[in-house]
Amino acid sequence: MASQSQGIQQLLQAEKRAKDKLEEAKKRKNKRLRQAKEEATADIDQYRLKREADFRRIQTSVMGSQGNLAVKIEEQTVEKIQFYSSSYNKYKEGVLKELLDLAYNIKPELHTNYKYKI
């Protein structure tokens, strides 16, 4: 009986050691997962910072050239407004005279395709 009791004790101790090893393995696994997550987060943050810096650099280069474009567009707009204004003043009288002539000098005549029937 003592040998059975001793065998049972050995089995219980072996079971306890196995359970302890499993718990230890779970702890190591959780620790590795946390560490991997922290490393991944650090890598992601570093990548994000790099991409944001690249974006800002590109944005400033584009916005800087857009500022120059805005000035050029403004100059071209002023030039076109002046051109159209001078053209308006130059041709205003002639166009108005033509329109009034067309309105006042009416020559009634039949259309060429009209066929008169009696």
Swiss-Prot record:
What are its GO cellular component terms?
Answer: synaptic vesicle membrane; vacuolar proton-transporting V-type ATPase, V1 domain
Give the record's GO biological process terms.
synaptic vesicle lumen acidification
Question: What GO annotations for molecular function exist for this entry?
Answer: ATP hydrolysis activity; proton-transporting ATPase activity, rotational mechanism
Q: Where is this region: Disordered?
A: 19-39
Q: Name one Pfam family in it.
A: V-ATPase_G
Lineage: superkingdom: Eukaryota
Keyword line: Coiled coil, Hydrogen ion transport, Ion transport, Transport
* Coiled coil feature spans: 3-54
Write down the InterPro entries for this protein, in alphabetical order. Answer: V-ATPase_G (IPR005124)
Q: Which NCBIfam families match?
A: V_ATP_synt_G
Question: How is the subunit organization of this protein annotated in UniProt?
Answer: V-ATPase is a heteromultimeric enzyme made up of two complexes: the ATP-hydrolytic V1 complex and the proton translocation V0 complex. The V1 complex consists of three catalytic AB heterodimers that form a heterohexamer, three peripheral stalks each consisting of EG heterodimers, one central rotor including subunits D and F, and the regulatory subunits C and H. The proton translocation complex V0 consists of the proton transport subunit a, a ring of proteolipid subunits c9c'', rotary subunit d, subunits e and f, and two accessory subunits.
Q: What does this protein do?
A: Subunit of the V1 complex of vacuolar(H+)-ATPase (V-ATPase), a multisubunit enzyme composed of a peripheral complex (V1) that hydrolyzes ATP and a membrane integral complex (V0) that translocates protons. V-ATPase is responsible for acidifying and maintaining the pH of intracellular compartments and in some cell types, is targeted to the plasma membrane, where it is responsible for acidifying the extracellular environment.
Q: Which family does it belong to?
A: Belongs to the V-ATPase G subunit family.
PANTHER family tied to this protein: V-TYPE PROTON ATPASE SUBUNIT G 3, VACUOLAR ATP SYNTHASE SUBUNIT G
> What name is this protein filed under?
V-type proton ATPase subunit G 3
Which organism is this entry from?
Answer: Xenopus laevis (African clawed frog)
